[in-house]
Amino acid sequence: MVMGLGLFLLVFMLGLGLTPPTLAQDNSRYRDFLAKHYDATPQGRNDRYCESTMRRRHLTSPCKDINTFIHGNRHHIKAICGDENGNPYGENLRISKSPFQVTTCNLRGGSPRPPCQYRATRGSRNIVVGCENGLPVHLDESIFRP
């Protein structure tokens, strides 16, 4: 009985030790997603907005060809990964049931070297995300290309 309890406690403690890094990694990928693609209340949504926001978020070294910022409520974006605001889309992706306000920043010119100049395109559309453990970690920007 004592031996069984000791083994149980050992396995339980090992399980606790392994879980937090996994959760931390998931949260890290989600935080990266938010840093690259989420801006709750943008100012301007024009070319200057794209250039300053891309620079502030360190997405300009080298210049990124395209980046889309999603505006609105973070909870609604998370909900795409469940049935509340998302449906399966393609292979391992989810599409939002409701449209989001977005600003897509397209690199002008062909050089990947700063200074980066962007053209802003504003719109409202459904978005497609990749999810891990119920959190969005990837935005499929192929649907935003002209």
Swiss-Prot record:
**Record's PROSITE patterns?**
RNASE_PANCREATIC
**Family annotation (InterPro entries):** RNaseA, RNaseA-like_dom_sf, RNaseA_AS, RNaseA_domain
Q: Which cysteines are joined by disulfide bonds?
A: 50-105, 63-116, 81-131
Q: Name one GO cellular component term.
A: angiogenin-PRI complex
Record-linked Gene3D superfamilies: Ribonuclease A-like domain
What GO terms are given for molecular function?
actin binding; copper ion binding; DNA binding; endonuclease activity; heparin binding; protein homodimerization activity; RNA nuclease activity; signaling receptor binding
Which SUPFAM superfamilies does this chain map to?
RNase A-like
Kindly report the protein's main subcellular placement as a broad class: secreted
EC class name: hydrolase
The UniProt entry, under Pfam families, shows: RnaseA (PF00074)
Q: Where in the cell is it found?
A: Secreted; Nucleus; Nucleus, Nucleolus; Cytoplasm, Stress granule
GO BP terms: actin filament polymerization; angiogenesis; antibacterial humoral response; antimicrobial humoral immune response mediated by antimicrobial peptide; defense response to Gram-positive bacterium; hematopoietic stem cell proliferation; innate immune response; negative regulation of apoptotic process
Cite the active-site annotation.
Answer: 37 (proton acceptor), 138 (proton donor)
Q: What EC number(s) are associated with this protein in UniProt? A: 3.1.27.-
Ordered alphabetically, the record's keywords are:
Angiogenesis, Cytoplasm, Developmental protein, Differentiation, Disulfide bond, DNA-binding, Endonuclease, Hydrolase, Nuclease, Nucleus, Protein synthesis inhibitor, Pyrrolidone carboxylic acid, Secreted, Signal, Stress response
Signal peptide residues are: 1-24
Where does motif Nucleolar localization signal map? 55-59
Known activity regulation? Has weak tRNA ribonuclease activity by itself due to partial autoinhibition by its C-terminus, which folds into a short alpha-helix that partially occludes the substrate-binding site. In absence of stress, the ribonuclease activity is inhibited by RNH1 in the cytoplasm. In response to stress, dissociates from RNH1 in the cytoplasm and associates with cytoplasmic ribosomes with vacant A-sites: ribosomes directly activate the tRNA ribonuclease activity of ANG by refolding the C-terminal alpha-helix. In response to stress, the angiogenic activity of ANG is inhibited by RNH1 in the nucleus.
Q: Which PANTHER family match?
A: ANGIOGENIN, RIBONUCLEASE
Self-association and partners: Homodimer. Interacts with RNH1; inhibiting ANG ribonuclease activity. Interacts with PCNA.
What function is annotated for this protein? Secreted ribonuclease that can either promote or restrict cell proliferation of target cells, depending on the context. Endocytosed in target cells via its receptor PLXNB2 and translocates to the cytoplasm or nucleus. Under stress conditions, localizes to the cytoplasm and promotes the assembly of stress granules (SGs): specifically cleaves a subset of tRNAs within anticodon loops to produce tRNA-derived stress-induced fragments (tiRNAs), resulting in translation repression and inhibition of cell proliferation. tiRNas also prevent formation of apoptosome, thereby promoting cell survival.
Family recorded in the similarity comment: Belongs to the pancreatic ribonuclease family.
Listed name of the protein: Angiogenin
Q: Which organism is it from?
A: Chlorocebus aethiops (Green monkey)
